[in-house]
């Protein structure tokens, strides 16, 4: 199963498978930065990088937000902050620029412990000379969320399954790297950590309109702001367990389901509908840690 807990180390330093019939043009892009992959988890492994891009496409084909650029010039300074995906150390990139409609995600691998598959979340920042609206990329922080990107670490000792083509469904052993990447990207987008998400959690129930309408009532939450383990929804017309539950089993594939997308919609992301022709669908824990300094939040999957 996947469990969500507070990460003490973080709080100490920082508080598909379908044929698409019709689909609007993507509005956002996700760029993976391997410059902190000092452990070599991705170096020389084109298959792993390809799977990351395939995981990102689950979001870039559905999210239609218009994110403003962040440009450090003159008196305007934007310093991006995140945890090094290969060491966990705090990284600050001074006068960092982000292109319009792009999210940058730093990725790498490290020893995350005996049961941790991945760790990820949106990055933080310190800045001067920018308005609050500009820092949040033109999004209202009360009802929306506009990160610059974030970071994801993958456990380098996990028994991974690296699919050659995530659009196919076959039996496999090990833990599905693609599914973990999709889950952690959900956290980079603010699932479980964005203020606009937290504002909708009441008595451990998620009360967002889109999610409640789809589920048939308030959605029960699991540990540390995941969906409750065992909830199901559909992805490309196929019923499966939700991606943003706190756990995944070996030999299990999880796409980002309609309930997962509804959660993003409720926290402010503009999610387009999709028409698809479905094909047949064929534990470790997701650990989630929140941190507060500079608005940084990071999630872990184990």
Model-assigned labels for residue ranges:
Residues 27-182, 188-275:
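Extracellular zinc-dependent metalloprotease catalytic-domain scaffold
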């Amino acid at each position: 199963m996947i469990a969500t807990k507070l990460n003490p180390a973080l709080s100490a330093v920082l508080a598909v498978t379908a044929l698409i019939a019709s689909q609007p043009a993507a509005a956002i892009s996700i760029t993976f930065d391997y410059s902190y992959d000092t452990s070599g988890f991705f170096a020389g492994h084109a298959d792993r990088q390809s799977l990351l891009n395939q995981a990102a496409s689950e979001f870039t084909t559905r999210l239609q937000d218009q994110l403003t650029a962040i440009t450090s010039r003159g008196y305007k300074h934007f310093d991006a902050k995140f945890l090094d995906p290969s060491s966990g150390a705090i990284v600050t990139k001074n006068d960092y620029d982000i292109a319009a409609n792009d999210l940058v995600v730093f990725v790498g691998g490290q020893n995350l412990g005996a049961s941790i598959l991945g760790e990820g979340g949106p990055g933080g920042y310190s800045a001067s000379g920018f308005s609050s609206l500009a820092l949040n990329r033109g999004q209202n922080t009360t009802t929306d969320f506009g990160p610059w990107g974030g970071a994801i670490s993958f456990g380098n000792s996990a028994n991974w399954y690296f699919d050659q083509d995530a659009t196919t469904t076959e039996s496999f052993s090990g833990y599905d790297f693609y599914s973990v990447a999709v889950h952690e990207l959900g956290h980079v987008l603010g699932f479980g950590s964005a203020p606009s998400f937290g504002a909708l959690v009441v008595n451990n129930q998620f009360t967002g309109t889109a999610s409640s309408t789809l589920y048939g009532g308030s959605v029960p939450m699991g540990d540390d702001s995941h969906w409750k383990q065992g909830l199901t929804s559909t992805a490309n017309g196929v019923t499966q367990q939700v991606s943003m539950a706190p756990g995944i089993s070996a030999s299990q594939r999880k796409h980002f389901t309609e309930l997962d997308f509804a959660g993003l919609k409720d926290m402010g992301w503009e999610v387009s509908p999709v028409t698809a022709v479905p094909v047949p669908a064929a534990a470790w824990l997701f650990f989630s840690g929140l941190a507060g300094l500079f608005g940084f939040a990071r999630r872990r999957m184990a």
